[in-house]
């Protein structure tokens, strides 16, 4: 897995972002989506690296050479999901039609009354989980790397002051301690398992025709605290429609110590396999706009590098 995502920086300004979000709430979601078209066209034309990454991914997921319209749909899906996040942060759930698949898996995990890891990816919307949370009384603390999305986070936190309490910043000295604490208190923690900080342990797994590297830390955390892992993705289907999918991919309680490494590898491969399945099902929902298969390692802040290494060793 490439570490290039750590070098990606936001474009634009906080003022511009606040202006767009404010206008969206003024005119409503339908009109706001129309406003996204010129913005998407601009970024598609002038963001060369992102466009190249989009084309490479879509060629794998679609099984053919993507057309310009495919690239545009990819950018527009990303912009729509980003816009919808702000409506969800303001509890505007009535704007969306959400279907849930794997309700039995979700309900079984809730009935146990224990903490659980929700392992997602930059595929679709994790925020749409808030809509399901109203029915299931589900609150999830999200583990995020915040340094390359400061403007978005600033605007989001201003809209929903309770949001910072549900975010665990990745790459800090106390990151994993907070994760352990939440899980030990039987809370749910969401982690995106398709990115890793430099220095973190990774293992290869087949993904869309080529091996990619994925982090092992979620599985080590689950083993340490004997908590299950559910794969979760919230796919955007167009219009106001989303689908939430839940699948159990790892049961840490049943793994003997001597079999841990093999169990981690199997679970990681299962994660990569389910991620590939949903990428093919909804290819325009893939929001990693960099070369995912490039194993290059750009420089990473020292605190993130050291912290991730310590976190991995603590879980072995």
Label for each model-derived stretch:
Residues 101-103, 143-145, 170-172, 247-249, ...:
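Conserved beta-strand termini and adjacent loop/short-helix elements that scaffold enzyme active sites
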Residues 1-120, 155-157, 162-164:
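Membrane-anchoring hydrophobic helices of lipid-metabolizing enzymes
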Residues 15, 50, 98, 171, ...:
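Soluble or luminal CAZymes and related metallo-dependent hydrolases
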Residues 110, 135, 173-316:
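Non-catalytic C-terminal accessory region of glycerolipid acyltransferases
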Residues 106-107, 130, 156-157, 179-180, ...:
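Short amphipathic alpha-helical segments and helix-helix/interface helices
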Residues 66-67, 80, 112-172, 185, ...:
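Catalytic core of membrane glycerolipid acyltransferases/transacylases, capturing the structured
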Residues 96-100, 149, 169-173, 211-212, ...:
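A conditional alpha-helix N-cap/helix-loop micro-motif detector
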